[in-house]
Amino acid sequence: MIDEDGYFGEDVAERYDRSSGPSFQPDVIERTVQVLAELAGGGRALELGIGTGRIALPLARRGVPVHGIELSRAMVAGMRAKPGGEAIGVSIGDFATTTVDTRADGAFSLAYLVFNTIMNLTSQEAQVACFRNVAAHLEPGGCFAIEVMVPELRKIPAGQNIVPFHTSPTGWAYTVYDTVTQDATCHYVEVTEDGVGSARSVPFRYVWPAELDLMAQLAGLRLRDRWDGWTREPFTEDSAQHVSVWEKPVS
């Protein structure tokens, strides 16, 4: 159920960091933070959808000043409860339109969106607005990095629109795609040991790499790098995800 925290209320925030998914593994977080620290180049970083600080906190420990934008107060409270969480500034709001005052500390050398978070913006207009918002916060030469999946439409059998992506003895999850609008919804079903079930759904809008490049162009940014992941392996037709970096021209 959606509330003022969007789809990431207290129930989600409480268990968010207990995920066993690949993006939550320490070695993956370390690689992610290493690349982001290099892209920041000694400047400030802006995380869109900072959440519980999974990436922001270790990045800050590397000496990179981090500020976040986050809609969910519950997720921010989770970050505040962690060591170092109180020191990170957060602006509460939609990261497509929320602005950060840069008059005191200057513009950012890096903005970033990880773990498919660009897809939480459920319209093309909002995704374009996000790029423009980022461009307004970046210093000349600054970078915008996005980690996002490549839409898995090749997995959908002809005539179907459902792709399961998780099954276990206590739960399952699947995505329902609308290939006309590029809208999709992830459905999560869980059953406790005593047989009590729960379900939640999260909508998103999937987006293609070339579409992201056009959004960047509309915002005055240009593609600098695109990799298969944080190990900087080449992006190919078989890549299931990509890390893309766009740059704000110096002049």
Region spans (language model):
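Conserved class I S-adenosyl-L-methionine
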Residues: 1-51
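Class I SAM-dependent methyltransferase SAM/SAH-binding core
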Residues: 52-99
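A short acidic, Gly/Pro-enriched loop at the edge of an enzyme's catalytic core
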Residues: 100-110
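A short SAM/SAH-binding and catalytic strip from SAM-dependent methyltransferases
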Residues: 109-125
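A short glycine-rich, Lys/Arg-flanked "PGG" loop and its adjoining helix->strand segment in the class I
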Residues: 128-140
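SAM-dependent methyltransferase
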Residues: 145-215
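C-terminal lobe and adjacent flexible extensions of AdoMet/dcAdoMet transferase-like proteins
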Residues: 209-251
